[in-house]
C-alpha cells in the first residue's frame, strides 16, 4: 500500500508515523524545500514534532511531481482549511482520477463559506472524497497512543476498504456517511475551545467549563439543523462531535484552548496571533462561521461572542458574561 500525505505540519507528520506500520511507502509532501530537506536529513520534523523520529519508509519531498507520479492507495490532504483550495488547484493536474482523497482540514472557508469536502469536490470532482476527523492530538498519534477517529464519505464500500487497510491496534477508524455533521463538529469545536480556555484562564472553575461545552454542543446542533433537516444522533454523540469537543475543550494541549487560556490570563490577542507559528483554527474559522450563521438566519451565541472579542474589540469581561 502506498499513501501520499500533502501537508507536512504536525498532523500530517503524525499521520505519516501512525500509518508507517501498515504501509509499504508513505510520501510526506511539504511546499517548503528547506523544511523538507531538514526532515530528510534529520529524520524528524524539527519545526512541528521535534521529538518523534520518522520511520525509514516515510519519504519527505517538496516535489509534487515526485510524490504523485504513481498511483496511490489514497491521498491525505493535511493542510489548514484556508489553504485547501490553493493546494487542490496546485495538484489538480497531478492527481489520478478515482484516487480517494482523505481530508483532515477542519473549518469553513472564507468568502465561499464552504466546508472542506465542498472545496475539494468543486476542484477535484472525479475523486472520491472523505473526511478524516475526530479527537486526535498529533503528539499522541505520533507516540502511538490509542485513538479512534472517523472516516466520513458517501461510498461505504470504498470507505470500509480504506478503514480495513489503514486501521491498526492503536489507530482505529470508524465509518460514517454523515460528512456534513462530522465537518460541523470539527469546525465549531475549535471556537468553543477558545471560550473554554478563557474560562479556565480566568480560574472560573470546571463547572463553568462544562456549562460552556454543553452550550457549545447546542450550537453545533443548531448549525447542523440549519444545514440539514435530519440530524444523525450517532454523529453528535460520536468521536467527531462530542468526542473531539471534549478533548479540545479540556486540555491545554489544544492550541485553541491554550490560546483562550492566555486571553483569560490577560495576554494581548494581536501580539499572540503574530507570534504563533501554527494556525489557531478557531480564530480563522469564526469569521466565516458568523457570516454563514447570518446567511442561515441562526444564532450561535458563544461563537458570536468569541467573534466580537477577536474582531470587534468587545471587552473580555463582557465576553465572559455572554459565554456564561
From Swiss-Prot:
GO terms for molecular function: glycerol-3-phosphate dehydrogenase [NAD(P)+] activity; NAD binding. NADPH binds at residues 10-11, 31, 106, 138, 255, 279, 281. Belongs to the NAD-dependent glycerol-3-phosphate dehydrogenase family. Pathway: Membrane lipid metabolism; glycerophospholipid metabolism. InterPro entries: 6-PGluconate_DH-like_C_sf, 6PGD_dom2, G3P_DH_NAD-dep, G3P_DH_NAD-dep_C, G3P_DH_NAD-dep_N, NAD(P)-bd_dom_sf. Sn-glycerol 3-phosphate binds at residues 106, 134, 136, 189, 244, 254-256. It comes from Ehrlichia canis (strain Jake). One of its GO terms (cellular component) is cytosol. This is Glycerol-3-phosphate dehydrogenase [NAD(P)+]. HAMAP family: NAD_Glyc3P_dehydrog (MF_00394). PANTHER family: GLYCEROL-3-PHOSPHATE DEHYDROGENASE, GLYCEROL-3-PHOSPHATE DEHYDROGENASE [NAD(+)] 2, CHLOROPLASTIC. It catalyses: sn-glycerol 3-phosphate + NAD(+) = dihydroxyacetone phosphate + NADH + H(+); sn-glycerol 3-phosphate + NADP(+) = dihydroxyacetone phosphate + NADPH + H(+). Transmembrane segments: none annotated. One of its GO terms (biological process) is carbohydrate metabolic process. The active site is at residue 189. Its EC number is 1.1.1.94. It holds the Pfam family NAD_Gly3P_dh_C.
